Amino acid sequence: MHHLRALVGVGLAGLAAGVPLTDKISVKPRQAPGAQNVVYWGQNGGGTIENNDLAAYCQPNSGIDVLVLAFLYQFGNGGNIPSGTIGQSCYISTSGQGQNCEALTAAIHTCQSAGVKIILSLGGATSSYSLQTQAQAEQIGQYLWDSYGNSGNKTVQRPFGSNFVNGFDFDIEVNGGSSQYYQYMIAKLRSNFASDKSNTYLITGAPQCPIPEPNMGVIISNSVFDHLYVQFYNNNNYTVPCALGINGNAPFNYNNWTSFIADTPSAGAKIFIGVPASPLASTGTPSGAQYYAAPDQLAAIVGEYRSDAHFGGIMMWSAGFSDANVNNGCTYAQQAKSILVNGAPCASSGPPSSTPATAPAPTATTMPSSTSVSSPAASPTGGTVPQWGQCGGEGYSGPTQCVAPYQCVKQGDWWSSCR
């Protein structure tokens, strides 16, 4: 994904699943299966700031079918509770407590009621996560289910209250010798999915395009993924380079991906064409423009592969960059939707309108209790941003005070972190 990622901390172990929180959480279909538009939301940088109201991306004409919440970016390394900052305000601590997550919780319900799937992503391009053992991977997998799935578990923190996500995404961009353990985390999640027959959950991944894939290849070879959001950008200089095959870049290796997964447990996975949502999106700087596909270029690429049985749609990084990239009255997400639905970018009349089919709305509407959203204990300095967390940068509007004893250190125009 985009190179600007935050880092936070970790905590304790997960507990066993209990009675589901609710019997049913139906998600309305927004378009025919096999042609979905997936957008990452929750991280800012590169001079863009996304709308902090997630529900704004779930309007009928938003062009978005799946929203991936980014990221829980610290886990392992001695603790088994994933933590991170999602959006400009929702912080999930190393104890699993949610701080300022009420608005996001309400928006998740709104989006699911509108037919938009909500996926929670782990990882990112930082190096604050790793797995040391199979047991640890299984513990973290169980905790994720208990805290974010329809588990019925009331002994753990639930940052989104009784609402639960529609699946879990793995954007593992750091190997560290631990990739062989993720299969156990995914298997633990899937065993819990099976306990909730009223709902359907997804396991998704966002691998880099090179094959062999350096960080997620082993994971994909040993796990069952439903969606693969392949990042066809930022890999011109890899040993086996790959990209979208445009602008003089490396070749587009979509067919290599269908061949690769054919002999893995993920043989049935849908492959999504992962693209930057603006000329700045892939790197946060103008240098990333080489990886950007203009709407007409994207339409040509999709047109060539959309009939493939593995084709799943388009994935883009990210919501904020899409918002800043408007052509013919359409954001990049709306352009992608038009390409998937109509086979061409938006006309000058603006974005296509989605008309979701009628279906029961999710019943999980309870806001987090005071227990589940209690704030982490304040440090002596009153700061809330943990070690490695983002505390500044052009366009950043989140918290800026670091927990003691860390200080906010500038590392570039777009990024400062607590060190």
From Swiss-Prot:
| Coiled-coil annotated residue ranges, if any | none
Positions with biased composition (Low complexity): 350-381
Q: What is its EC number?
A: 3.2.1.14
For this record, the Gene Ontology CC terms, alphabetical, are: extracellular region
Per the UniProt entry, what is one GO biological process? chitin catabolic process
- Location in or out of the cell: Secreted
| Residues bearing carbohydrate | 153, 237, 256
> Family per UniProt?
Belongs to the glycosyl hydrolase 18 family. Chitinase class III subfamily.
What's the protein here called?
Answer: Endochitinase 2
Q: Which organism is it from?
A: Metarhizium robertsii (strain ARSEF 23 / ATCC MYA-3075) (Metarhizium anisopliae (strain ARSEF 23))
Taxonomic placement: Eukaryota, Fungi, Dikarya, Ascomycota, Pezizomycotina
